[in-house]
Amino acid sequence: MKTLIVYFSLEGNTDYVAKRIAENVGADTKRLISKKIYKSKGFAKFLSGGRSAIKEETPELESGDIDLTSYDCVILGFPVWASNVAPPLRTFVKEHQIELQAKSLAAFACQGGSGAEKALAKLKGTIGIEAFAAEGIFIEPMRQQSEDTDAAIDAFCEEVKGV
């Protein structure tokens, strides 16, 4: 099964998990780059990113077109912003909704607090599916590296391999 991980990462947590998963399951990766610049520090980060997420913005991407035809499974990864999917991933999902519905899908969310469950539910709704084949929630995985985090990533990978 050929797998692609499509993800957005602002501070590196989602990038860290995506690369760990890619190594474990032998997946290709595609990091989404937004043309909109998001603040990465302080209160402005939460204000601008949260507002953008709540308003369900779909910023233009610099990442170029992503061809999903050769992939059987797509894993979507994102940071949680105000209990929502980060806007750049929302853009990708809306642009590829029909293609994604025909794939085996998994998703993971990285968060500093809470809201990942709601964000994953909203992502399923945006795609138009009932469930992901695998779901993972990771709390600041890059900053809080531990055996528990490693075990959670490994468990997610095992679920993906079972798809």
Placement of each model-derived feature along the sequence:
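Short, glycine-/small-residue-rich phosphate/pyrophosphate-handling segment
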Residues: 106-141
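N-terminal beta1-alpha1-beta2 submodule of the flavodoxin-like/Rossmannoid cofactor-binding fold
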Residues: 1-76, 83-85, 90-95, 101, ...
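Glycine-rich phosphate/pyrophosphate-binding loop and the adjoining helix
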Residues: 132-163
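Short flexible/disordered coil segments
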Residues: 89-104, 134-146
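Redox-cofactor binding/interface segments in oxidoreductases and associated redox assembly factors
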Residues: 76-77, 107
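Conserved donor sugar-nucleotide recognition element shared by glycan-biosynthetic enzymes
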Residues: 85, 116-120, 149
